[in-house]
Amino acid sequence: MKISRQAYADMFGPTVGDKVRLADTELWIEVEKDFTTYGEEVKFGGGKVIRDGMGQGQLMAADVVDTLITNALIIDHWGIVKADVGIKNGRIAAIGKAGNPDIQPDVTIAVGAATEVIAGEGMILTAGGVDTHIHFICPQQIEEALMSGVTTMIGGGTGPATGTNATTVTPGPWHMARMLQASDSFPMNIGFTGKGNVSLPGPLIEQVKAGAIGLKLHEDWGTTPAAIDNCLSVADEYDVQVAIHSDTLNESGFVETTLAAFKNRTIHTYHTEGAGGGHAPDIIKACGSPNVLPSSTNPTRPFTRNTIDEHLDMLMVCHHLDPSIAEDVAFAESRIRRETIAAEDILHDLGAFSMLSSDSQAMGRVGEVIMRTWQTADKMKKQRGPLPQDGPGNDNFRAKRYIAKYTINPAITHGISHEVGSIEVGKWADLVLWRPAFFGVKPTLILKGGAIAASLMGDANASIPTPQPVHYRPMFASYGSSLHATSLTFISQAAFDAGVPESLGLKKQIGVVKGCRTVQKKDLIHNDYLPDIEVDPQTYQVKADGVLLWCEPADVLPMAQRYFLF
């Protein structure tokens, strides 16, 4: 017996050759592979397959998955496929075909009495987002980020201190200890960066040994060539990443000076376009260096008619500037350039900018990383057309390029890709389920370490889960010791060896960063283009390999007002 393709999609979700529109964008993805055996699909519910003696077998808990997501459409850097996903002990155990191996063929994921089921039919499954530019100004950011689909936050801060309002720095062992202890309370993977601005190694080493997973160089603390060189030397010794916000005012040198101070060592350049800070007007040149891992922050994503006006006000507040002081106003205006922001759109589409992050509450919005990424992808498709690597009638390669910017590439950059950043067997089961119509805007379900940490949920007093008001609420993995079992605190190997988790009484699972210093841009998936960038110092026009980069600002964006009426 055969059923129509439409009926099949309605029952089990799309299969090979079917196309799905992402939210209200002009982006379409096409299913490349289906792990299902047709006629042997598993689905839970009354009269459905996953029942005793049918799709559910008799195996003990040790031999079946704890949680099964059925018939999900996976979007990840490695493919766009339809599969069942099995989770065991908080990690992704299998991607394949679920069922009862006693009676069904080709089963790679055994289902038993110990298995919970999440229906993925008609849903999109992605890895949780990794935001690597966090100012930890207030703890409420964490819930905001989680509800947007972000499951890992990396950055620095101590709360709403003036230093934290401007810089992603948790300075010194005492503050590092307090923030690590505080992070035990949140269903989020968290790692902290220390202050990198010092010219002798001792103050940096003590921060790494206290738990810092990286060091941040910020112009507001003085990003001089001496500080850059010293910071990178310590990072090389202790295998932690360095992030940099370079010298907008060009006081201690120009972009060439900073690039020379890197001495070909690996570094993550924040907001590499420059509106968020960095050598004016040409920090964007850095994205052409093989040792530079370039990212954007989300307020310039994508370039719209409102971008310039918004940025001037943001900058005055975030960097403690005084609008009555002419030099402060000139400093602000030097950072905001239409030409380089427009070029940033195109450099993302070419894969020259490799990552996207928030800059939370410090010229960025913590809950909009994912949304702004896909808005940029949509704008570029409309303005530049399909990418050469895309298949006929689909945007699969573009989708893989853009999802990598906030999942696998930041994870690789900061030495945590062995734990998070993609849907791959063995990794922490930080997973996000989306209805296609709400993709990138409002997730349906967020899993942390294999347990549901947050979800859209209706009235708790209703007779079913769906009545209004439906809004985001923390779920059971956000509470008690379940939180500690399902989320990670990242620290350096030096801190782990020094017994920092035990000495501070940390209860969350501990992840150790590794491989930070060997990463090169060529390792950043689908985003490794190394253009030769020129910036005209008078007009700010940007050229990549001799080609002028310019695009018009958008007047209207998808994934915007129609999703936020309620």
From Swiss-Prot:
Q: Which InterPro entries match?
A: Amidohydro-rel, Metal-dep_hydrolase_composite, Metal_Hydrolase, Urease_alpha_N_dom, Urease_alpha_subunit, Urease_AS, Urease_asu, Urease_asu_c
Quick one: where is this thing mainly located?
cytoplasm
Q: In which pathway does it act?
A: Nitrogen metabolism; urea degradation; CO(2) and NH(3) from urea (urease route): step 1/1
A molecular function annotated in GO for this UniProt entry is: urease activity
Keywords of this entry: Cytoplasm, Hydrolase, Metal-binding, Nickel
Q: What SUPFAM superfamilies has UniProt attached to this entry?
A: Composite domain of metallo-dependent hydrolases (SSF51338), Metallo-dependent hydrolases (SSF51556)
Keyword Cytoplasm assigned:
yes
Q: What is a biological process (GO) this protein takes part in?
A: urea catabolic process
One Pfam family this sequence matches: Amidohydro_1
Q: What is its EC number?
A: 3.5.1.5
Q: Which residues form the active site?
A: H319
Q: Which GO terms describe its cellular component?
A: cytoplasm
Query: Quick one: which residues bind Ni(2+) 1?
Result: H133, H135, K216, D359
Summarize the PTM comment.
Carboxylation allows a single lysine to coordinate two nickel ions.
Identify residues that carry N6-carboxylysine: K216
Cofactor dependence is on: Ni cation
Q: Where in the cell is it found?
A: Cytoplasm
Residues that hold substrate according to the record: H218
PROSITE patterns, per database record = UREASE_1, UREASE_2, UREASE_3
- Return the cofactor note field: Binds 2 nickel ions per subunit.
Residue intervals of the Urease domain: 128-566
Listed binding positions for Ni(2+) 2 are K216, H245, H271
Question: Catalyzes what?
Answer: urea + 2 H2O + H(+) = hydrogencarbonate + 2 NH4(+)
Could you give the subunit structure recorded for this chain? May form a heterohexamer of 3 UreC (alpha) and 3 UreAB (gamma/beta) subunits. May also form a heterotrimer of UreA (gamma), UreB (beta) and UreC (alpha) subunits. Three heterotrimers associate to form the active enzyme.
Give the record's family classification: Belongs to the metallo-dependent hydrolases superfamily. Urease alpha subunit family.
Protein's recorded name? Urease subunit alpha
Q: Which species expresses this protein natively?
A: Pseudomonas savastanoi pv. phaseolicola (strain 1448A / Race 6) (Pseudomonas syringae pv. phaseolicola (strain 1448A / Race 6))
Q: What is the lineage of its organism?
A: Bacteria, Pseudomonadati, Pseudomonadota, Gammaproteobacteria, Pseudomonadales
